[in-house]
Amino acid sequence: MRPPVTGGRGGGGFRGGRDGGGRGFGGGRSFGGGRSGDRGRSGPRGRGRGAPRGRGGPPRGGMKGGSKVIVEPHRHAGVFIAKGKEDALVTKNLVPGEAVYNEKRISVQNEDGTKVEYRVWNPFRSKLAAAILGGVDNIWIKPGAKVLYLGAASGTTVSHVSDLVGPEGCVYAVEFSHRSGRDLVNMAKKRTNVIPIIEDARHPAKYRMLVGMVDVIFSDVAQPDQARILALNASFFLKTGGHFVISIKANCIDSTVAAEAVFQSEVKKLQQEQFKPAEQVTLEPFERDHACVVGGYRMPKKQKTPAS
């Protein structure tokens, strides 16, 4: 175990749970063959609201000033838990010394004297971090992975995915807004494993020459036709047997029915497009009426073993 180090000042941390599961934030729903059954429904519509994107939550997501901090590996490869007076989700900074969105950084000294810098991952500003703290079984984004990220915005979560996949991996980050795209491009100048693409994710043919086959697609486009957008991109870029992670915002699809009904409808749409959803977790309390669905794509049928 690494020796304790002193964390700097900042906002409060986020409870990560001892096993990195974030037990206090609701479980997920398994779609058959998963690790669990129905571990927890998406929260009711009246619950405490997660802070709007880009604001709220602990402002810098750091550790309490003056506390001793120990960094331990999370069960998801490339993710870590910083434990002090408050626990926080962190990733190993691919570009030490550089912050992306004014996030708190923690420096840990190894026994051999070398230092490793980690960046606090704020779940109020990242759907993927919220899903991890919600107890998602597998995000499929790991060191060396090639990821297509749809709806990259200014690159907050993309930067942490960049940390996760490391120098051997690659993140193709697609964003339609030119304003957000400027921030994304600036971030990518220092992160050589991020390839920013300022295009509409509805038209993957426009960037087919820029993107290779990928292991995982992460989608956070918040559009009524987001299942179709994911399917279009998967048909171009997602390898057979690859995986997807999609953030679903119920109000963007149908604000007239319960969030749970919207999630069920979207899962059915995904199943019709050769996706095999494996689990669903709520993003409460970080985001209201959001769910994250994870699964496989064009999964090979299991071979029946002949009787001996």
UniProtKB/Swiss-Prot annotation:
One Gene Ontology CC term in the entry: plastid
User: Keyword Iron, does the record have it?
Assistant: no
A single GO BP annotation from the record? rRNA processing
Cite the residue spans of the region called Disordered.
1-68
- Write out the biased-composition intervals (Gly residues): 22-35, 53-65
Question: Per the entry, what induces it?
Answer: Repressed by abscisic acid (ABA).
Reactions performed catalytically: a ribonucleotide in rRNA + S-adenosyl-L-methionine = a 2'-O-methylribonucleotide in rRNA + S-adenosyl-L-homocysteine + H(+); L-glutaminyl-[histone H2A] + S-adenosyl-L-methionine = N(5)-methyl-L-glutaminyl-[histone H2A] + S-adenosyl-L-homocysteine + H(+)
Compartments in which it is found: Nucleus, Nucleolus
Keywords in UniProt for this one? Methyltransferase, Nucleus, Ribonucleoprotein, RNA-binding, rRNA processing, S-adenosyl-L-methionine, Transferase
An annotated Gene Ontology molecular function? snoRNA binding
Q: Where is the composition biased (Basic residues)?
A: 42-52
Name the positions where S-adenosyl-L-methionine binds: 156-157, 175-176, 200-201, 220-223
Expressed, tissue-wise, as follows: Expressed in roots, leaves and flowers. Expressed in stems.
**Which principal EC class is assigned to this enzyme?**
transferase
Give the domain of life.
Eukaryota
InterPro entries this protein is in? Fibrillarin, SAM-dependent_MTases_sf
Q: What is its EC number?
A: 2.1.1.-
Spell out the PANTHER family in the cross-references: RRNA 2'-O-METHYLTRANSFERASE FIBRILLARIN 1-RELATED (PTHR10335:SF0), RRNA 2-O-METHYLTRANSFERASE FIBRILLARIN (PTHR10335)
Q: Subunit structure of this entry?
A: Component of box C/D small nucleolar ribonucleoprotein (snoRNP) particles. Interacts with SKP1A.
Family per UniProt? Belongs to the methyltransferase superfamily. Fibrillarin family.
Function, in words: S-adenosyl-L-methionine-dependent methyltransferase that has the ability to methylate both RNAs and proteins. Involved in pre-rRNA processing. Utilizes the methyl donor S-adenosyl-L-methionine to catalyze the site-specific 2'-hydroxyl methylation of ribose moieties in pre-ribosomal RNA. Site specificity is provided by a guide RNA that base pairs with the substrate. Methylation occurs at a characteristic distance from the sequence involved in base pairing with the guide RNA.
Q: What is known of its domains?
A: The N-terminal DMA/Gly-rich region (also called GAR domain) is rich in Gly and Arg and functions in nucleolar targeting.
Q: What is this protein called?
A: rRNA 2'-O-methyltransferase fibrillarin 1
Q: List the source organism.
A: Arabidopsis thaliana
Q: Which gene encodes it?
A: FIB1
